[in-house]
A protein has these predicted regions:
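Conserved thiamine diphosphate
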Residues: 8-9, 131-175
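Generic beta-sheet signal
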Residues: 34-36, 85-87, 113, 184-190
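Glycine/aspartate-rich loop-and-adjacent alpha/beta segment that forms the canonical ThDP
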Residues: 177-239
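Active-site diphosphate/adenylate-binding microenvironment
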Residues: 2-73, 78
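Glycine-rich beta-alpha junction loops
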Residues: 40-42, 119-122, 191-196
Length: 239
C-alpha cells in the first residue's frame, strides 16, 4: 500500500496506545464468526480506517445517524441472538456512559460480550474541530472544561465484570487474546493520548480526495486521473 493507514512509527509509540495499532491487532485476533459493533466517535473512525473485516465477520455502526450510546445495547441484542459468535462492542469513554447501566443486563443474562472502551479523556472529534477552527477553545470537551469520566475499573468491578487495562502498545496483544478467549463478559479500557488525532481527515474547503495532512501539490496531482478541484478559500474562511 502506498499510503498505509497503520504507519511504522505508530508501533514505536511508548506511552499510551495508538488506536490504529490497536485495531490492527484486534482485526488479526478475531475469527471469521465475530460481530463487531462500534459506537459514534473517534473510535469508530479509527476502527473503520484500520480494522480489516474478514469473510464471515460483521461490522455494524449507526454511522451517519451518529447516536452516542448505540453500540452497547446493540451488542447486547447481537449477543442474545448469536450465541456462537464473539460479540465485540467498540465504545468511547463518552459514549459508554450513555447506557453504562446496561452492564447489569450483561451480568443478569450472562452475555460474554467484550466491551472495549477507548479512553481519550473527552470528546476527541469535537476537540480536534475546536483545535482546527476555533483557536483551541476547548469548551465542554475536556476534564478542564467539564467533561469527566468515572473510574471504569471500579464501575466494572461493581457489576462483577472482569476489568482489563491496556495502557501501551506492548500490552495490546496479550490482554486482547486473553479477553477474547474468555467465555465471560470482559471490560477492556484502552488508554489513548488525550490529543490523539484522526488521520487522514478532510478539512473544510477541500475536495474529498485532498485529505489532511496534505500531500505536496506535485504528488497530489500525480495521483489524480481527472482534473483537480481547487481548494475553496471562501468555504474555508467561512468556517
Amino acid at each position: 500500500t502506498k499510503y498505509p493507514i497503520i504507519q511504522k512509527e505508530y508501533y514505536q509509540q511508548k506511552k499510551f496506545v495508538n488506536p490504529y495499532v490497536f485495531f490492527g491487532e484486534l482485526s488479526n485476533l478475531l475469527n471469521n464468526k465475530s460481530i463487531i459493533i462500534a459506537d459514534d466517535g473517534g473510535h469508530l473512525t479509527w476502527a473503520i480506517q484500520s480494522f480489516k473485516v474478514k469473510k464471515g465477520q460483521k461490522l455494524f455502526s449507526a454511522f451517519g445517524n451518529s447516536p452516542m450510546g448505540y453500540a452497547f445495547p446493540a451488542a447486547i441484542g447481537a449477543s442474545v441472538l448469536n450465541k456462537k459468535s464473539k460479540i465485540i462492542c467498540i465504545d468511547g469513554d463518552g459514549s459508554i456512559q450513555m447506557n453504562i447501566q446496561e452492564l447489569q443486563t450483561v451480568v443478569a443474562n450472562k452475555l460474554p460480550i467484550k466491551i472495549i472502551v477507548l479512553n481519550n479523556s473527552g470528546y476527541g472529534i469535537i476537540k480536534q474541530f475546536q483545535e482546527l477552527y476555533l483557536n483551541k477553545r476547548y469548551e465542554a470537551t475536556t476534564p478542564r472544561s467539564g467533561v469527566t469520566n468515572p473510574n471504569f475499573k471500579k464501575v466494572s468491578e461493581a457489576y462483577g465484570i472482569n476489568y482489563n487495562l491496556i495502557e501501551n502498545n506492548n500490552k495490546i496483544k496479550k490482554i486482547l487474546k486473553k479477553s477474547i478467549q474468555s467465555n465471560k463478559p470482559e471490560f477492556i479500557e484502552v488508554l489513548l493520548k488525550a490529543d490523539q488525532k484522526i488521520i487522514p481527515k478532510l478539512q473544510f474547503g477541500n475536495p474529498i480526495e485532498d485529505l489532511s495532512p496534505l500531500l505536496s501539490r506535485s504528488e497530489f496531482r500525480k495521483n489524480m486521473f481527472v482534473k483537480t478541484i481547487s481548494r475553496s478559500k471562501k468555504i474555508f474562511e467561512a468556517n
